[in-house]
Amino acid sequence: MAPTTITALAKEKTLNLDFVRDEDERPKVAYNQFSNEIPIISLAGLDDDSDGRRPEICRKIVKACEDWGIFQVVDHGIDSGLISEMTRLSREFFALPAEEKLEYDTTGGKRGGFTISTVLQGDDAMDWREFVTYFSYPINARDYSRWPKKPEGWRSTTEVYSEKLMVLGAKLLEVLSEAMGLEKGDLTKACVDMEQKVLINYYPTCPQPDLTLGVRRHTDPGTITILLQDMVGGLQATRDGGKTWITVQPVEGAFVVNLGDHGHYLSNGRFRNADHQAVVNSTSSRLSIATFQNPAQNAIVYPLKIREGEKAILDEAITYAEMYKKCMTKHIEVATRKKLAKEKRLQDEKAKLEMKSKSADENLA
């Protein structure tokens, strides 16, 4: 299937079958049924060790990471005007005509640009979203030909936004390092040379949102993800393997911080890798901007501290590139097994119907 854009499909009365998920994967909680279980942590006073705020912030982050692997931060130092401008420009990009957005399509292995939905290898349902990706750090990784030229001001604003998020990411890594009982700079050192990828998600309104997902259930592979979401709602989290879900309460100007697989392994499993998904709705489009703070490909992945009585959750040290490959292989294997099981179930149901039909014909004869 090659839709022009998801925005175009949003005008249909029924959901295209390529986006329909199995019943057990469909949303269990509404996009706006908000929960206050994810803590909102003020970073005010973080840079001033004299007032005792830093240890208190560390304690709150420890609890959040042990419970969910997710927390929200306010008083983070990112200018509200920059946040508003980044959000405005992002919405203006997705409002462009399809042919202008498709000038930056990522087909053919292009690195960065505009993507219409995604489907995991082995999966059989697509995500209800469009997104733009750009790689901003290290700076020599930037390919400005893949950064949209419209709307005006996109490049200059995204450069500033990326720079400010790098600073915030560095602060958060220091606090997380202390929260793990390490020296302030240990987590940053373990990343070797921090990479940054920014992914801007746009979720158009959906004709049948109860049948699909904006983004399938997953964990992020990197160290941390810093997410800016609008006030619509749709980010959901689980901590019991997907049995129950909560919708994260949007907070004006806040950033949601997710711990990724890399951070989970470095903490020796003490801190959860945030298990999350995104749902959509039929009344309001939604925008979120995810900034992935990832280690270098050659960074070594192994617990930085193993507490007394614990065992390492990894058998041996591996590189981040190897860890990423293993995680993706596992996701693909799970999706493939599920797809094959579904196909077998459908075949069995078809065979039963054929048997019933044959039996009915014999009775009539």
From Swiss-Prot:
PANTHER family: OXOGLUTARATE/IRON-DEPENDENT DIOXYGENASE (PTHR47991). Its EC number is 1.14.20.5. Pathway: Secondary metabolite biosynthesis; flavonoid biosynthesis. Its cofactor is Fe cation; L-ascorbate. GO terms for molecular function: flavone synthase activity; L-ascorbic acid binding; metal ion binding. GO terms for cellular component: cytoplasm. Residues 345-365 are annotated as: Disordered. Involved in the conversion of naringenin to apigenin. Acts via a direct 2,3-desaturation of flavanones instead of a sequential hydroxylation/dehydratation mechanism. It comes from Petroselinum crispum (Parsley). Its main location: cytoplasm. Fe cation binds at H76, H218, D220, H276. Pfam families: 2OG-FeII_Oxy, DIOX_N. This is Flavone synthase. Belongs to the iron/ascorbate-dependent oxidoreductase family. It catalyses: a flavanone + 2-oxoglutarate + O2 = a flavone + succinate + CO2 + H2O. Residues 194-295 form the Fe2OG dioxygenase domain. It is found in: Cytoplasm. It is an enzyme of class 1 (oxidoreductase). Keywords: Cytoplasm, Flavonoid biosynthesis, Iron, Metal-binding, Oxidoreductase, Vitamin C.
